[in-house]
């Protein structure tokens, strides 16, 4: 009887300013749904998802960080042992794009070059409100030597391709760049002891 290979686990930490859609990207990937009611992440939220690949299974541990300044002191400890840093900005909020430089630099200060960084321009559904072009996002990705992709959590655009791109870049995963959408299965939800959802705030958020 063949031995069972241990489940490879990879920690993904989501970073970026408040309201750029980090939680919405994770929710769309995990459950294929979008919540129009904005809820600010308080502290750190943790979810996990298993990806079944051709000859092995990996567990992605998704750490959703709060974008508010008062929680910034918590973030370095979560970056330190991460495999992937997903830096998100809102294409309709230029300041959030400019601030990605600080987030990327913070990751590199904590992890040097031993981490995969993905720059994500979210909310592409806000066509009329766009303030950051795809060319600018791609240029910044090239400038910092990181991967780049645009998404819309609201429309479900490029969410699974984002995670396939990440999976293909993981150590030993180079052969899985063509992982199929249907190979992704939801498995688990584990809130951390120091995380919770903030009070619901009125108004729709196209995150």
Curated annotation (Swiss-Prot):
The keyword Nucleotide-binding applies. It is found in: Golgi apparatus membrane. Its main location: Golgi. A lipid is attached at residues 205, 207 (S-geranylgeranyl cysteine). GO terms for biological process: protein transport; vesicle-mediated transport. Protein transport. Regulator of membrane traffic from the Golgi apparatus towards the endoplasmic reticulum (ER). It is a lipid-anchor. SUPFAM superfamilies: P-loop containing nucleoside triphosphate hydrolases. Pfam families: Ras. Keywords: ER-Golgi transport, Golgi apparatus, GTP-binding, Lipoprotein, Membrane, Methylation, Nucleotide-binding, Prenylation, Protein transport, Transport. The modification Cysteine methyl ester is found at residue 207. GTP binds at residues 16-23, 64-68, 122-125, 152-153. GO terms for cellular component: Golgi membrane; mitochondrion; vacuole. InterPro entries: P-loop_NTPase, Rab, Small_GTP-bd, Small_GTPase. A motif (Effector region) lies at residues 38-46. One of its GO terms (molecular function) is GTPase activity. It comes from Arabidopsis thaliana (Mouse-ear cress). This is Ras-related protein RABH1d. The keyword Glycosyltransferase does not apply. Gene3D superfamilies: P-loop containing nucleotide triphosphate hydrolases. The gene is RABH1D. PROSITE patterns: RAB. Belongs to the small GTPase superfamily. Rab family.
């Amino acid at each position: 009887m063949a031995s069972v290979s241990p489940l490879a686990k990879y920690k993904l930490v989501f970073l970026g300013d408040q309201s750029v859609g980090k939680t919405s990207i994770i929710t769309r990937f995990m459950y294929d749904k979008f919540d129009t009611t904005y809820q600010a992440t308080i502290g750190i939220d943790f979810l996990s998802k298993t990806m079944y690949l051709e000859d092995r299974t990996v567990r992605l541990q998704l750490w959703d960080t709060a974008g508010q300044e008062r929680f910034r002191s918590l973030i370095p400890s979560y970056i330190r042992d991460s495999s992937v840093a997903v830096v998100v900005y809102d294409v309709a909020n230029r300041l959030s794009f400019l601030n990605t430089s600080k987030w990327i630099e913070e990751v590199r200060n904590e992890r040097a070059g031993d981490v995969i960084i993905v720059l994500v321009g979210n909310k592409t559904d806000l066509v009329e409100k766009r303030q950051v072009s795809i060319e600018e996002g791609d240029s910044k990705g090239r400038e910092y030597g990181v991967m780049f992709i645009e998404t819309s959590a609201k429309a479900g655009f490029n969410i699974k391709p984002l995670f396939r791109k990440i999976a293909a870049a993981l150590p030993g995963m180079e052969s899985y760049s063509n992982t199929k959408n249907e190979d992704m299965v939801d498995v688990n939800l584990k809130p951390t002891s120091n995380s919770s959802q903030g009070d619901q705030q009125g108004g729709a958020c196209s995150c």
